[in-house]
Amino acid sequence: MEKDFQDIQQLDSEENDHQLIGDEEQGSHVQNLRTENPRWGGQPPSRPFPQRLCSKFRLSLLALAFNILLLVVICVVSSQSMQLQKEFWTLKETLSNFSTTTLMEFKALDSHGGSRNDNLTSWETILEKKQKDIKADHSTLLFHLKHFPLDLRTLTCQLAFFLSNGTECCPVNWVEFGGSCYWFSRDGLTWAEADQYCQMENAHLLVINSREEQEFVVKHRGAFHIWIGLTDKDGSWKWVDGTEYRSNFKNWAFTQPDNWQGHEEGGSEDCAEILSDGLWNDNFCQQVNRWACERKRDITY
């Protein structure tokens, strides 16, 4: 029996060897067919399972790493965005507070400026009033100072009048001619200022009625231009004391009066003056000239 069992095993071994040899021959034949025929369309043998499992694991790891990296990037961007948004709102709030503070400061400054302007206007009003008062006091003082010599001359004239038994007299520094007293200035004024000065002396600007009086005036006034009491401000020439102009003595220079308006001062020539050669000329009334005052000798004060 043992021999029979050994024979059976030998038989199986031979069959297996024969089958393996056949398989090898068949595989060799198939390999030869693949080599000889490039169009062989057979599927390649599949890889072992462990190798396939390892490839899938690597892909999963790569996908997981990519997802983690993407999540980190999203978190960083989100954090920066929140920080920027926070800084933006902080800056906006700061700007709003600055605008509010600046507006309040401007309003306060405007309010203080208005108060200061009011105070400044009030002070200007007070100063203007003070200036007017000072000018008024100055005019009064000037009036008294100018009249003090006049009062002194009046007393002197009255004393001379009584001492001369009623003889008429002229004040000190006045020159007598033909029953009138004349005073010649040593400085200059405009025509209106000179006329006012003579009135303060109880006199008037010089009025010339004759050739003799003209020569007397030219002799005493020197080589200066002097104002006389003749004007056409109203459109026609008139003497300040009311003396008739048309029928009275005249000594105009050639082509005068011409009312020339080409000078720089502007306006017309409405006031008469005696030139250095003794002839009369119409001139701009704001011109500064010397002048002469005249009054009757028989006036006593």
From Swiss-Prot:
One of its GO terms (cellular component) is endoplasmic reticulum quality control compartment. Its main location: membrane. Expressed exclusively in hepatic parenchymal cells. The keyword Membrane applies. GO terms for molecular function: D-mannose binding; fucose binding; pattern recognition receptor activity. The chain crosses the membrane at residues 59-79. Residues 1-29 are annotated as: Disordered. Disulfide bonds join 170-181, 198-293, 271-285. Residues 1-58 are cytoplasmic. Residues 80-301 are extracellular. Coiled coil: none annotated. It is a single-pass type II membrane protein. CDD domains: CLECT_DC-SIGN_like. A lipid is attached at residue 54 (S-palmitoyl cysteine). Residues 169-295 form the C-type lectin domain. Keywords: Calcium, Disulfide bond, Endocytosis, Glycoprotein, Lectin, Lipoprotein, Membrane, Palmitate, Phosphoprotein, Receptor, Signal-anchor, Transmembrane, Transmembrane helix. The modification Phosphoserine is found at residue 13. It is found in: Membrane. The keyword Repeat does not apply. One of its GO terms (biological process) is regulation of protein stability. Glycans are attached at residues 97, 119, 165. Interacts with LASS2. Calcium is required for ligand binding. Two types of rat hepatic lectin have been identified, RHL-1 and RHL-2/3, having a relative abundance of 4:1. RHL-2 and RHL-3 only differs in their carbohydrate structures. PANTHER family: MANNOSE, PHOSPHOLIPASE, LECTIN RECEPTOR RELATED. This is Asialoglycoprotein receptor 2. It comes from Rattus norvegicus (Rat).
